Amino acid sequence: MRFSLHPLSTSDLKALEASQFPEGFSGRAVPDSMPPAFVASRALQLEAAAEAPPVPTSYLIVRLEDSRFVGACGFKTGLGERRVEVGYGVAPSAQGQGAATTALKLLAEVAFSSGSTEVLAEVAPDNIASLRVVQKAGFVLVGERRDEDDGLVTQWVLRSGA
């Protein structure tokens, strides 16, 4: 299957922050494909902190065969920084089809074209599916840290030109 990214506008993120579907999205979204309200809120804060974001910071993952939204992904830190952090999630019904791997590769392209040289993804060591995603996308394990919310996470980096 093939996938692409659909950028989320500020108005889309505001609707998601209010736990509502953005206009025109409800018929295209598979169950559990929309980002949670706290993710939309973080994206709005990130966009507000940037004077004028050159590119969107948040995206929906689109399955091209039927144009349905199957997940979401985006940047957790500002584009243009040397290292940017990304996050992603795919609806259970669409997992195992390459959506997250493709989305991660496309996010890395956006990051590198915006001046970043490294993309960071943090993954819980027991999240086998996500560990496979970062490995398939070309990320390399560089360390681990204890997150106050998520506990132990492994840190995976993809460098520009890798």
Regions found by a protein language model. Give the residues of each.
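GNAT-family acyltransferases
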Residues: M1-E85, V90-S93, V110, S114, ...
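Short coil/turn segments at alpha/beta junctions that flank glycine-rich nucleotide-binding fingerprints
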Residues: Q97, S114-T117
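A SAM-dependent methyltransferase catalytic signature shared across enzymes that methylate proteins
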Residues: A137-L141
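Conserved acetyl-CoA-binding loop-helix of GNAT-fold acetyltransferases
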Residues: Y88-V90, G96-V110, R132-K136
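Conserved hydrophobic beta-strand within the GNAT/NAT acetyltransferase core sheet
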Residues: V119-V123
